[in-house]
């Protein structure tokens, strides 16, 4: 059954229910004759897919909108398993995006991570996922750019009232890649991105992603 939602999704009526049955019911209502034979975790599916190519695959990792990992474990090492099974091994979904739930003192949490967490639907949970996954990287970058702007180290001529500094999740994660890959002399891709936020007076230094310039720090620090 579905225990909880993550990554901003919120459908309370689905909590505690079997998502496969819910999906099948909706498919049937639409006259779509599909029978779901298995629901597979993405990291488990990644491991299984690669296992078709090599029988030595032992870990599957997903780094996408969220993050997770699955690995092959000896059944003898799984004390929670009370049912006897024929196989000596089992694939375990680690759900490592939840590392830091309730206690994140062992993680390198910054003030940016704390702000991200405080404005989510599940504060205090999925801490590692919020620190590194694609769903949040754009917002982490935006918050860091806002911090640099507040210290007049980036886009100092742009008002703090600009949507880039005020509107949550307006800076999509793929923009980080676009910025880092822009090697044109005048950083035209970066200029275009800034102009989409109404910033038309950026300096060359603002747009420069070489060395330790402000925009590079905003993306990578």
Model features per residue range: what roles?
Residues 1-51, 55-59, 75-107:
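Glycine-rich phosphate-binding loop and adjoining helix at the ATP-binding site
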Residues 25-28, 51-53, 59, 76, ...:
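ATP-binding/phosphotransfer module of carbohydrate and carboxylate kinases, centering on a glycine-rich
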Residues 43-44, 61-66, 221:
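A short acidic Gly-Thr/Ser loop motif
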Residues 58, 62-66, 95, 132:
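Short glycine/serine/threonine-biased micro-segments
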Residues 70-74:
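Short beta-strand-to-turn element immediately C-terminal to the catalytic PLP-Schiff-base lysine
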